[in-house]
């Protein structure tokens, strides 16, 4: 369980651009559309990726087999903790694949939210929810929530929906405090490693600023060009420093050679 679930706005598992399961905070209506746009523009050639813009942190964990683990959180959430969320989702997928069965077949040609029921307990564990029905109230657009709303007409109105959506991300339950400590201890060992991974992989990319699907690719390309420019500039500065050192050494040698000639009055010392 994360220390403050209210800081987590969205998290999901996707294969390619198909969202297999997701958690959507009721405090962020419509954020899943932004998340899908980000997933469609997943940065290539990265295993871990994080960027903060407009007080939101967008974090990716990308596997070679096209699985993408993605989250949107408040900028105040610590980076190691946001990476822990994605690593927890990754371990859940690895367990499903290891167990085999129909779940593996489902992943061959996945459909939207095909693993929602399987992964609801994992989302509940992450945000510290005991009752999965409460968790499902935040899974906006999931098959279970749509079916439940169709059975309950009182939720169709905005007023009824607000009444039905009980506060999910409040203070942790007392019964979960021990569980929270255990999870904090378990993820503590990964903090240093995740933090170092984040530092070397973080790029300055605006993932969803104006809704343009080409924003991420454009900004990533600009970032790479900027990195190349900085490398070239650093190389030029290094060459300049080398030449300065060589010229300084040459001047010292010339002065010492002149002093030697003056003391010996030419090359008489050698002739003697």
From Swiss-Prot:
Keywords: Coiled coil, Membrane, Protein transport, Transmembrane, Transmembrane helix, Transport. It is a single-pass type IV membrane protein. It comes from the Eukaryota. InterPro entries: Longin-like_dom_sf, Longin_dom, PHYL. The chain crosses the membrane at residues 243-263. GO terms for cellular component: membrane. Residues 12-116 form the Longin domain. It is found in: Membrane. This is Phytolongin Phyl2.2.
């Amino acid at each position: 369980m994360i220390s403050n679930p209210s800081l987590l706005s969205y998290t999901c598992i996707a294969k390619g651009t198909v969202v297999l399961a997701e958690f959507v905070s009721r405090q962020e209506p419509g954020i899943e559309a932004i998340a899908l746009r980000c997933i469609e523009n997943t940065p290539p050639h990265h295993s871990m990726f994080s960027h903060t813009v407009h007080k939101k942190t967008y974090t990716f964990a990308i596997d070679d087999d096209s699985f993408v683990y993605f989250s949107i959180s408040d900028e105040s959430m610590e980076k190691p903790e946001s990476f822990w969320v994605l690593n927890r989702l990754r371990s859940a997928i690895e367990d499903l694949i290891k167990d085999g069965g129909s779940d593996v077949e489902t992943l061959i040609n996945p459909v939207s939210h095909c693993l929602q029921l399987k992964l609801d307990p994992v989302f509940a564990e992450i945000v510290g929810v005991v009752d999965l029905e409460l968790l499902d109230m935040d899974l906006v657009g999931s098959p279970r929530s749509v079916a439940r709303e169709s059975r309950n007409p009182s939720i169709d109105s905005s007023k009824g929906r607000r009444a039905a959506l009980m506060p999910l991300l409040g203070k942790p339950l007392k019964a979960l405090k021990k569980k929270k400590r255990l999870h904090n201890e378990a993820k503590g060992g990964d903090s240093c490693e995740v933090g170092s991974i984040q530092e070397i992989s973080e790029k300055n990319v605006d993932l969803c600023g104006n809704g343009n699907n080409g924003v991420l690719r454009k900004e990533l390309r600009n970032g790479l060009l900027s990195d190349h420019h900085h490398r070239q500039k650093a190389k030029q500065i290094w060459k300049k420093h080398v030449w300065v050192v060589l010229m300084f050494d040459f001047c010292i040698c010339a002065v010492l050679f002149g002093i030697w000639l003056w003391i010996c009055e030419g090359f008489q010392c050698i002739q003697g």
